[in-house]
Amino acid sequence: NHGLAPEERKSTYPAPIVLGRNVWIGSNATILQGVTIGDNAVVAAGAVVTKDVAANTVVGGVPAKIMKHITK
């Protein structure tokens, strides 16, 4: 992201987004920096993911929350 103080606004602090295996991302979903999405997870369309997503879950909303656990 970036600093809030005027002298820090030009600096950014990038972090990777890590996607597990077999992840589905819906259209217009926003995933913030530093988030890890676990294996077999689904991110609903339009969701804003601000925290890590556990494996085998469906998340959605603003901010994204667990909507369902996927059972095999």
Set out the residue ranges of the language-model regions.
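Short conserved catalytic/interaction loops centered on acidic-Pro-aromatic/His motifs
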Residues: 1-3, 38-40, 54-56
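Flexible, glycine/small-residue-enriched loop-and-beta-strand segment within the central core
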Residues: 1-35, 70
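Glycine-/alanine-rich, low-charge beta-solenoid repeats
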Residues: 18, 24, 36, 42-44, ...
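Beta-rich strand-turn-strand
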Residues: 27-42, 47-51
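Conserved beta-strand-loop-alpha-helix hinge in the C-terminal portion
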Residues: 55-72
